[in-house]
């Protein structure tokens, strides 16, 4: 008595257009393409149900809880202009559905199951609104932009980096030599590539030792603080932390993690260690395009960027707009603001579906990396501004005179662009002239 078994439409329970969202709700914007014959309201309700309390049939144990309190709600659906049978579904989730301080649990709940749902031809998570009531349960970046500048004693310009190439095959000693030449030439950072971990040709401990020697030698000769992103990513969390501990014992200022392949749990653990022990944390987004490149299915990078800010990282790769990797200018600047700023207004032209208030969570420096070189410097300086890292791999090591002259060229070009900008010159129009004048 009182329990009516059977399958019923999701929209009868989970489509609630009259719902007024709460300040504590986590809000999601999904781009959904229903299968032919599936109404948009049913598809949106299915997304809300399968990413919260629902299953395919009514169950007796529904009567032992309060679905009204815990269910996700599809509260709005809008058609996508210019697309046939495609919609943005807005879903509100009560805060109690999620474990505090766990990006892992957040993603397991919202995107863990629903993407294989057969009522949908395709589904993409476009944006999340993280309320302060939830974001305050995370430590966020280990240090943040201002603390990093204070640690490095570098202000008023973007920071310069370089990924050591070839990414695989160098011995530890030759790797250290390349690091020294780049840092001595004027770069602030050099970087392990994302797949440099601990391979037979270069074990991690040997690399760390030779890189530390290069760091201290270049610091002594230039009088500047230098860093190398020592990749601590490993097969286990225990091994990852062991490598981070060794980096700290050597006196290195920064370590690195591949946060998508390494996982959010490992990343958050490493971020806690870095905060407690004064290490900066550089984040590489290896594997992101598997998740974010398709327009209609997957997760947009702005969501992965928000997740990283909560999980913890001081730098993250964010595309270039001008280099070899894909990225639209306005959309890229949208998630760059989501990484750096405290308060970001809703702006659909930049792909920002919700106003995001990070309250006091530190910001993350966006890293522009991938196919960029010295002639891109004016555009990069204008697009990314001072709070960024501009990273030239082939654009440094590919210089015809060698690594150190490549580093010098990048540093001279950057300082010329910053000075020209500060003097009020138009970098977009005069960029090439500024670079040529600086090279004389």
UniProtKB/Swiss-Prot annotation:
Catalytic activity: 2 (2R)-3-phosphoglycerate + 2 H(+) = D-ribulose 1,5-bisphosphate + CO2 + H2O; D-ribulose 1,5-bisphosphate + O2 = 2-phosphoglycolate + (2R)-3-phosphoglycerate + 2 H(+)
Primary role: RuBisCO catalyzes two reactions: the carboxylation of D-ribulose 1,5-bisphosphate, the primary event in carbon dioxide fixation, as well as the oxidative fragmentation of the pentose substrate in the photorespiration process. Both reactions occur simultaneously and in competition at the same active site.
Family, per entry: Belongs to the RuBisCO large chain family. Type I subfamily.
Cell compartment(s), UniProt: Plastid, Chloroplast
Cofactor names: Mg(2+)
Keywords (A to Z) from UniProt: Calvin cycle, Carbon dioxide fixation, Chloroplast, Disulfide bond, Lyase, Magnesium, Metal-binding, Methylation, Monooxygenase, Oxidoreductase, Photorespiration, Photosynthesis, Plastid
Residues carrying N6,N6,N6-trimethyllysine: 4
GO biological process: photorespiration; reductive pentose-phosphate cycle
Predominant location category: plastid
Gene Ontology cellular component terms for the protein in this record: chloroplast
Enzyme class label: lyase
Residues recorded as bearing N6-carboxylysine in the entry: 191
Record note on cofactor: Binds 1 Mg(2+) ion per subunit.
Site (Transition state stabilizer): 324
Entry's EC annotation: 4.1.1.39
Residues that coordinate or bind Mg(2+): 191, 193-194
GO molecular function, one term: monooxygenase activity
InterPro entries given in the database record: RuBisCO, RuBisCo_large_chain_AS, RuBisCO_lsu_C, RuBisCO_lsu_C_sf, RuBisCO_lsu_fd_N, RuBisCO_lsu_N_sf, RuBisCO_lsuI
Description of post-translational modifications: The disulfide bond which can form in the large chain dimeric partners within the hexadecamer appears to be associated with oxidative stress and protein turnover.
Protein's name according to its UniProt entry: Ribulose bisphosphate carboxylase large chain
UniProt-annotated binding residues for substrate: 113, 163, 167, 285, 317, 369
Active site feature: 165 (proton acceptor), 284 (proton acceptor)
Gene this chain is encoded by: rbcL
Assembly behavior: Heterohexadecamer of 8 large chains and 8 small chains; disulfide-linked. The disulfide link is formed within the large subunit homodimers.
Other information: The basic functional RuBisCO is composed of a large chain homodimer in a 'head-to-tail' conformation. In form I RuBisCO this homodimer is arranged in a barrel-like tetramer with the small subunits forming a tetrameric 'cap' on each end of the 'barrel'.
